[in-house]
Amino acid sequence: VIGKDVVIGSSVIVKNSIIGDRVVMQDNCKLGQKGFGFIPLKNKNIKFPHIGKVIVEDDVEIASGCTIDRGSIDDTVNGKNTYLDNQVHIAHNVRIGENSIIAGQVGIAGSSIIGNNVKIGGQAGISGHLKIGNNVEIGGGSGVIKNIPDNTKVMGYPAKNIREFLRDNKWYIKQPL
């Protein structure tokens, strides 16, 4: 299902998806593909079935080369007024709240929940099954491996509160370029 006033760039593939109104999908986006889920057995891995959908709510922009996997059982949801920069990957069952901005080359692993008004810097990675609160800012290149509460700014690997990060790395910050 594709809503009203949707812009679809070249080589975009949309399957198993519900697209809201006024959505922009730039070139080479792939939505609704099977996610990366396996059941590991002793001598073999069996692909886990994906029967959920991708839901893109109204007024979302998805830049070039983004991929959004369909949910395994639940849906993968991109909230209203959210912007995904180039080459962002959203894995199965991820839920992104409203008014969020996600910069280029971010990867969000399966079943993570991203709150409203979240900003994620480029090349950050978010591990699976995490909860990122509302009004959170994640610095570029950060590696998020634990939940982040509301109204928090983090950066680094592992991602930590920005004040703690700056205190721990002040020697590095003072180095000449």
Where are these regions (language model features)?
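Long, leucine- and charge-enriched amphipathic alpha-helices
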Residues: 160, 166-177
